[in-house]
């Protein structure tokens, strides 16, 4: 029993999909062991009297039989099963739930829309970096949750009865992707939103985070098409035009959109456009977790960390036995360089955070081998679970670590989409210099330096006589100037 007592499972019986998440608690954080998702499309089985069809219920039970096999090894007190919008609505939900409990061998709780919204917010708060004050949007199959909050506390919670399955059945039933279908779907969504918009705006937010299949699909499309990961109204409108151009739902083809997500994508897109328009949202990013993560963290009674990225970096440093003092030393030098050039280069605060994060992890490759350490570092960072970092930010960190020393691979810096290519180049230059000047691994051996930027020219001024007194240091700096010059990054050292 010992090896299973640290296992926890969260099951979400959604209106579009059923999901199961199995995790292991490791030193106050969670390690994902299993994620299973099945498209059950329960909401599509509701008739005009809100009764679930036998076929829809059978699809659900069939899925739960798969889940039940995995649950046998987990203590019942460490399993939570919740049902959302469709089972709140269905007049025969009792029949479905009775059999579901029999199959799973544990209670199934039908949660209110507000409780669902609260759990979604907790899942986001535990797994998503960025500003403290946030608006969270989750478009489900039959309901949409909108939550504002600061840190771990929610300030307003709304669960609205519109979702990508119900809007599909209502506004895209003819399977046409016409302008009029989108217009009707958006208009209806805006009417549902209007009564709650004022209160959401009153509480306000600094960042907007999306936590649903629709937003996940958008992220996958944008990554596949090499765009940056920020979702904007302009991008949503472009995708709508692309969908209209395809004409029919069965002919919908967009680079990066999987067949599995395509069916409910137009309806989800229409709802999201309405949310952006009605709430005047400038940009949205993808959340690291939502309802299932909220359930798991709730069972574990873990406090929400103020800075999720810092917790992630600490855990990784411990796990891979990174020299934390050295990581801090490099980070301090890099931060000093960044502060000296940020105005000339018009760098944003998030770029500073990502540079410091790269410094904290730059020696992770040594845990594999000194040979090709940068390649090992890039591989590890690209493939590790890093709560608080978006997929594009992970890719940027991996690219910076790949280019921390040796000749520079410019194309890799241009293939990431977390920041503009020029910014990635600038962060890479600062990281490389910081690693060089902290390489003696002692604070008292880091020289006092000034770094000036004039367009792309960097001028580094060292203490009088430093280059003469440090012949190896001079050789390393000369080599670095040469490597940077190969990719047209002028560097002068005095």
Curated annotation (Swiss-Prot):
InterPro entries: ATPase_NBD, GppA/Ppx_hydrolase, Guo-5TP_3DP_PyrP, Ppx_GppA_C, Ppx_GppA_N, PyroPPase_GppA_Ppx. It comes from the Bacteria. The gene is gppA. HAMAP family: GppA (MF_01550). This is Guanosine-5'-triphosphate,3'-diphosphate pyrophosphatase. CDD domains: ASKHA_NBD_EcGppA-like. NCBIfam families: PRK11031.1. Pfam families: Ppx-GppA, Ppx-GppA_III. Pathway: Purine metabolism; ppGpp biosynthesis; ppGpp from GTP: step 2/2. Disulfide bonds: none annotated. GO terms for molecular function: guanosine-5'-triphosphate,3'-diphosphate diphosphatase activity. Gene3D superfamilies: 3.30.420.40, Exopolyphosphatase. Domain 2, Hypothetical protein af1432. Catalyzes the conversion of pppGpp to ppGpp. Guanosine pentaphosphate (pppGpp) is a cytoplasmic signaling molecule which together with ppGpp controls the 'stringent response', an adaptive process that allows bacteria to respond to amino acid starvation, resulting in the coordinated regulation of numerous cellular activities. GO terms for biological process: guanosine pentaphosphate catabolic process; guanosine tetraphosphate biosynthetic process; nucleobase-containing small molecule interconversion. Belongs to the GppA/Ppx family. GppA subfamily. It catalyses: guanosine 3'-diphosphate 5'-triphosphate + H2O = guanosine 3',5'-bis(diphosphate) + phosphate + H(+). Its EC number is 3.6.1.40. Keywords: Hydrolase. It comes from Escherichia fergusonii (strain ATCC 35469 / DSM 13698 / CCUG 18766 / IAM 14443 / JCM 21226 / LMG 7866 / NBRC 102419 / NCTC 12128 / CDC 0568-73).
């Amino acid at each position: 029993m010992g090896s299973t007592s640290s296992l926890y499972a969260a099951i979400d019986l959604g209106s579009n999909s059923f999901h199961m998440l199995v995790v292991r608690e490791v030193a106050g954080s969670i390690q994902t062991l299993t994620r299973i998702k099945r498209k059950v499309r329960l909401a599509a089985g509701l008739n005009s009297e809100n009764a679930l069809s036998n076929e829809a219920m059978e699809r659900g039970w069939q899925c739960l039989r798969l889940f039940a096999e995995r649950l046998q090894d987990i203590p019942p007190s460490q399993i939570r099963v919740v049902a959302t919008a469709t089972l709140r609505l269905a007049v025969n939900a009792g029949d479905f739930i009775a059999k579901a409990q029999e199959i799973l061998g544990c209670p199934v709780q039908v949660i209110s829309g507000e409780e669902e919204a609260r759990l979604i917010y907790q899942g986001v708060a535990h797994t998503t970096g960025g500003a403290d004050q946030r608006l969270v949007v989750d478009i489900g199959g039959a309901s949409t949750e909108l939550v504002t909050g600061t840190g771990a506390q929610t300030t307003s919670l709304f669960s609205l009865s519109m979702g990508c399955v119900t809007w599909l059945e209502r506004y895209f039933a003819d399977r046409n992707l016409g302008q009029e279908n989108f217009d009707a779907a958006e208009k209806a969504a805006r009417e549902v939103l209007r009564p709650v918009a004022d209160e959401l705006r009153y509480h306000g937010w600094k960042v907007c985070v999306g936590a649903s299949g629709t937003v996940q699909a958008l992220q996958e499309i944008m990554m596949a098409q090499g765009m940056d990961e920020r979702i904007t109204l302009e991008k949503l409108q472009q995708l709508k035009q692309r969908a209209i151009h395809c004409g029919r739902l069965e002919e919908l083809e967009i680079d990066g959109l999987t067949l599995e997500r395509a069916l409910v994508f137009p309806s989800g897109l229409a709802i999201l456009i309405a949310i952006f328009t009605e709430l005047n949202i400038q940009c949205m990013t993808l959340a690291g977790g939502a309802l299932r993560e909220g359930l798991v963290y709730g069972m574990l009674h873990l406090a929400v960390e103020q800075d999720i990225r810092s917790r992630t970096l600490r855990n990784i440093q411990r796990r891979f036995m990174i020299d934390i003092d050295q990581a801090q030393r490099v980070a301090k030098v890099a931060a000093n360089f960044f502060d000296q050039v940020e105005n000339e280069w018009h760098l944003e605060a998030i770029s500073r955070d990502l540079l410091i994060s790269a410094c904290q992890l730059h020696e992770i490759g040594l845990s594999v081998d000194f040979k090709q350490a940068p390649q090992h570092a890039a591989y590890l960072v690209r493939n590790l679970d890093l709560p608080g970092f978006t997929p594009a930010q992970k890719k940027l960190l991996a690219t910076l670590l790949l280019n921390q020393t040796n000749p520079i691979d410019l194309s890799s810096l241009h293939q990431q989409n977390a920041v503009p290519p020029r910014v990635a180049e600038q962060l890479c230059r600062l990281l490389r210099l910081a690693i060089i000047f902290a390489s003696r691994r002692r604070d008292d051996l880091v020289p006092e330096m000034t770094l000036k930027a004039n367009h792309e020219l960097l001028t580094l001024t060292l203490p009088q006589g430093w280059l003469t007194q440090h012949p190896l240091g001079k050789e390393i700096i000369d080599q670095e100037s040469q490597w940077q010059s190969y990719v047209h990054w002028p560097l002068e050292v005095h």
